[in-house]
Amino acid sequence: MAVPVEEAIAALSTFSLEDEQPEVQGPAVMVSAERAATDSPIEYSDVAAYRLSLSEDTKALNQLNTLIQEGKEMASILYTYRSCVKALPQLPESMKHSQADLYLETYQVLDLEMSRLREIQRWQSSASAKLAADMQRFSRPERRINGPTVTHLWSMLKLLDVLVQLDHLKNAKASIPNDFSWYKRTFTQVSAQWQDTDTMREELDDLQIFLSTRWAILLNLHVEMFRVNNVEDILQVLIVFIVESLELDFALLFPERYILLRVLPVLVVLATPSEKDTEALYKRVKLNRLINIFKNDPVIPAFPDLHLSPAAILKELSVYFQKFSSQTRLLTLPAPHELPPREALEYQRHYLIVNHIGALRAEHDDFTIRFASSMNQLLLLKSNDGAYTEWCREVKGNMYDMVVEGFQLLSRWTARIWEQCAWKFSRPCRDAGETPEASGSYSDYEKVVRFNYTAEERKALVELVGYIKSVGSMLQRCDTLVADALWETIHAEVQDFVQNTLATMLRTTFRKKKDLSRILSDMRTLSADWMANTRPEHEMPSSQHGNDESRGNFFYPRPVAPTAAQVHCLQFLIYEVVSGGNLRRPGGFFGNNGSEIPVNDLKQLETFFYKLSFFLHILDYSASIGILTDLGFLWFREFYLESSRVIQFPIECSLPWMLIDYILEAQNSGLLESVLLPFDIYNDSAQQALVVLRQRFLYDEIEAEVDHGFDIFVSRLSESIFTYYKSWSASELLDPSFLFALDNGEKFSIQPVRFTALFKMTKVKILGRTINLRSLIAQRMNRIFRENLEFLFDRFESQDLCAVVELEKLIDILKHSHELLSQDLSIDPFSLMLNEMQENISLVSFSSRLATQIWSEMQSDFLPNFILCNTTQRFVRSSKVPPTQKPSVPSAKPSFYCGTQDLNAAHQSFARLHSGFFGIPHLFSIVKLLGSRSLPWLIRALLDHISNKITTLEPMISGLQEALPKSIGLLSFDGGVTGCMKLIREQLNWGTKSELKSEVLRGIKEIGSVIYTMGLLDIVLREVDTKRFMQTAPWLGLIPGAEGQIVNAQDGESPLVNLLKSATSAVVSSPGCLNPAAFYTMSKQAEAADLLYKANMNGGSVLEYTLAFTSASLDKYCSKWSAPPKTGFVDITTSKDFYRIYGGLQIGYLEEITAPQSAQHEVLGDSIAWGGCTIIYLLGQQLHFELFDFSYQVLNVSEVETVSASHTHRNPQIHQGWEGLLEGMKKARRLNNHVFSMLKARCPLEDKTACAIKQSGAPLPRVRFENTVSAFETLPQKGTVG
């Protein structure tokens, strides 16, 4: 079934082709099928149809316009001319025989360039002659026209401006005469064998005179103009026109104003060839008016990096025009570099944008608000077909006024940038060497650009560039929307004037003046649109009463604009009516001196005359916007490039890049969204290089700089983004109590920066290319995050295990930064990055880089060099162990830590709290960092370390066993403590095995450190599991029972499964469900998750498994370390059991640590007790140890001695000399009891291994655990044995 066209169009109108990309770039060329405001042709081909005796004027006008276009091309050639001599190769001595060939090649290259200069010479001669002839045509008495039209005056001035610029460029380009001298030298060499070279030599001499003579073009023009001495009148007319236009702001756009300013000093010199002509000129234009104009604009923009000075031009031309040298008042005007300091300061206040940025900002804000309001009214009007006519006219007229105001604003703003640049070029930085960026040597271009703009001036320039580009883009986007409104408004203005205003004048003021009435009638004839007085029948009022005049006031709106020829003719006719064509008429164009026209009518004519001038700019809408927003001149530096003798300046000297660099450095959130606008300057300069200057090499240089600059820009922008989000994350993760306790906590807060607009930029237009900035930033972010993780791991690998808390904190900050950034940017998942950096991508890889490093640190540094404090539950580094050699800590930018220096210091203060010990906080960090994937691998590595240590200790303990006597009995109470200690020393004959004793103690200490670490890890894991259980229990329907056990809250399925099943059934039953299989899959996944979480509720104990594993590892040495008694009863004299060895080691160790200046305890710590007591307990020797340990027996003897002494009243100093040792024994006994009590609680032998000794003394067989040293098995559930 076919869809009706109306419905199809309505459906298509609901689609939007616009994306969400913000407008942070300047206007771009658009392709549109709608009517645009640029459809008006700018030409004068239809002037002849109006029969106004303007055919001769129009012919000359077209000729001048052709010359102007040709002259601009000549100026482009001169401006972009670069020295060929610089590129000439220097022949070595060995190739001197090829000198002739080099001369020929050089001549051929230079001849091409010289041919262009000869073409410029010929063209300027022809153009000067044609301009002079055109001026003389208006000075002939037989001419039929009273004076040139305004359009003609502008064409004369534009051509004269082109000639002045050509002369200025020829004077400024030092490479041209240099190349010419080489050209002449090579010509002399290669033309020796040529015939008939006289003509070529004459041309060469003429070209040499032309190039070497300053102001040769102007002198030639002067000669051409005064071949007939009657052009003074037209020169005075031009001067009067310029002065009035400048004083009355008749020059609507800034390029026109600069043309007038550049031409005026030259015209003043040309118009004063004699005293009589000078007096005549000053009668029409007072000298003070000229001086004021020259003083108001001491520098005039001419080229991107060249400026003109009226005072300098007048002084220089006075040398060539002797009659003008008497004009002392004009010649005493100071040039820019001659200004007194006070005047220079005043001019600086005027020229520098930073002094006016507040007013400019207010203008921009006010205009954008009012323009948006006018656009809304226009869109409302377009959506309302039945709007009444008066309101339509008002809305469209208001839109026209806003466009005119926008053009004027753009003109003023762009002119400010031109003038500031010209002022900067005229006033180079004198103290460039004192700036921070300045090196030992710097070029002139660096003086006028790089070191000549302060930070505030750069900021103001960035703002103004943003205003120009944003307003230009706003005007460009609405081109097709406002076209009809602009054309209708212009049409209404013209028709109202010619049909109503002129009709009134014809009936009143000019009724009896036949000549003027004829002119007014001609104006009506060539411009009136009589068809506009009719309306469609359905719009005609029901009754039409009244006279013809009232009906003539209404015009049906038509988007038909006047042509350029009509505007040209209307301006001419108005001028004829007002001035009568009298060139010498005082009072200017619209002065009322001697005029018979009433003031009111004269004012109406003047107003419409000025409106006509702007009509052409409005009709040429896009071209006008392009001119007014073109800032490409900020890049060009041809003059300074030539004078500096370098191939190209570094990017740091480029003004567009300086603006980008300032935005990135300043971190001003208000300017950051404008960071792409300076790239529009590159777009403008590239367009100018290709279209205006037509030089591909300039475009290539711009492209190279843009490619290099954009890479730097993306890199630095990405770093700024990363730093901001890193600082934001670090600020949020700071302890609130820490911030509350500070008086200056605000320095840790981060001011918001708006990167969102840049994140949405998927189509950045640079040099005709479209770049996805969002994608580039995402790629850089992925790279920076990986580099940051790599740095954090490298940093951790160069520190000890205590730095794991800091590592976890820094990774948390980085992860939170990733979360914040992921809200605005699509980047790789953080878990993926972390796994990549940990080299843990494979599904069967469990030993991650971090786990390997932690185990390496434990094995090489932590276990040997850290000692345990059982009271604080912390390991601290032994001060008596030499520090382990580690690689130096890598340094990095603050952004790789916490973002800013202040935040780095704050987080470092927290990190230092955990840098001096290893304990529960560190294990929390390890559990979080390793996760459930790598933590079991680390646990297994620690268990294997216990097994390996036991294996290593076995021969050492055997050596100690061999040194003991075969039988060791109980200590006698008769000898007291002293006797006991003497007997113990005799029995423990290990004097020759001191090194062996130390190795055994260190081995037992490492075993104890591992076991204690496992105990702490068990505490941490239980807390983590409890927290996870509290989060998942409500979803699984689990609640605590009456006796503390976990029970299901309800029979059947868990709340999670029920929720997803009900949601699935509800969604699938809906007719709009397109993919029910996905919801069924989610429901099945919920059931699987329910089973997995419930199965994982009763996790085993790491400590219990460690003890069971250690017990299994001891099984193979049980026969050696715990020999069963031969009699079947407890043997109290055995000396080979482990508890005997450990008892001997312990009392020797206690003697050492209690000795004066001993540091043995700082080497072993409390881990020795955990290792020894655990082995004793698991061997079933706890009772033996408590009964027969040497230190325990000494304490018993000491207690008996103390009691006996108290009963017999003997010397209380009975234990003198043994107090320290006895106190150490008591502490050791308390620590041993604590260890045994913990072991009984976590690994009761009656449950797992049964009791090794009955009260009767009969031994029982042990339950053996299978030892799997080299393979990892799942931790056993609580209560199970293997």
From Swiss-Prot:
Quote the subunit structure annotation: Binds NAP1 and ROP2, but not ROP8.
Q: Which organism is it from?
A: Arabidopsis thaliana (Mouse-ear cress)
GO BP: any one term: trichome morphogenesis
Q: Which intervals of the chain form a coiled coil? A: none
Function description: Involved in regulation of actin and microtubule organization. Part of a WAVE complex that activates the ARP2/3 complex. Interacts with the active form of RHO-family GTPases.
Known InterPro entries for this protein? Answer: CYRIA/CYRIB_Rac1-bd, Cytoplasmic_FMR1-int
Instruction: Mark the transmembrane ranges.
Output: none
Protein name according to UniProt = Protein PIR
Tissue specificity as recorded in UniProt: Expressed in roots, root hairs, hypocotyls, cotyledons, stems, leaves, trichomes and flowers.
GO molecular function: any one?
small GTPase binding
Extract the Pfam families matched here.
CYRIA-B_Rac1-bd (PF07159), FragX_IP (PF05994)
Q: Which Gene Ontology cellular component terms are annotated?
A: SCAR complex
